[in-house]
């Protein structure tokens, strides 16, 4: 049916824009980027979907009824097939090699931090395993196993003694006193001797015997006398050596004094003889 147009007319070889069906059927080459050969545009998909909507709705109703009444394994298979189809549809670009397996979107990540030992299961896993296993074992055995596992999980720290505990503070004190008494009563040769402190612990050096007894005033001049203060630091070997040296000195002095006395006696005796003559 011809329409009356108002305005300038189109050129002779130009088609009118009203024939949308002719444009869809026209397979003229397109200038610019085009879709892949097996890829449908959204308009064609919408038209195809409009045409097949009635048939798909009927089939979908039948499939939904079958899925509701069918086994769960069949439902899972159909869901997986649908997911695979959704993943494959609309994919274009570089493809993986033939023998290369497609990785999951979220691959399992390695656990970071402290992990459970290899043979250790979480409480949730144990409960799931107990529920999944049918009643092959008696209920008494299962209850005992559950109680044992729960007790082992709740225990933290060292276990208490299983036998009777007879220890107490008073018993420990009595045992300790008994041991000390036995140690003192037995006594060795060294322990039988009276325990006394050495002289250098209880006595002051000779030059400090009057320490603190004199007038408490400052000294006007330094004390020229410097006694032997090595008494506090001498070892037994040093004391023995000093005693030997002191004995030798004393013996030498006594010999020298004796010789002088003998000489004086002789002189006195000669004087007496001379005076008597």
Curated annotation (Swiss-Prot):
Residue numbers carrying N-acetylalanine: 2
Phosphoprotein among keywords: yes
Superkingdom field: Eukaryota
Ranges of biased composition (kind: Pro residues): 108-117
Record region (Disordered): 1-240
Modification sites for Phosphoserine: 28, 106, 138, 143, 149-150
Motif GPALPP motif 3 per UniProt: ranges: 93-98
Segments of skewed composition (Acidic residues): 60-69, 81-90
Biased composition (Basic and acidic residues): 172-196
Signal peptide: none
Pfam families reported for this sequence: DUF3752
UniProt motif (GPALPP motif 4) ranges: 113-118
Keywords: Acetylation, Phosphoprotein
Annotated motif GPALPP motif 1, positions: 7-12
Motif (GPALPP motif 2) on chain: 32-37
Phosphothreonine PTM positions: 147
PANTHER family documented for this protein: GPALPP MOTIFS-CONTAINING PROTEIN 1
Protein name: GPALPP motifs-containing protein 1
Taxonomic source organism: Bos taurus (Bovine)
Lineage of producing organism: Eukaryota, Metazoa, Chordata, Craniata, Vertebrata
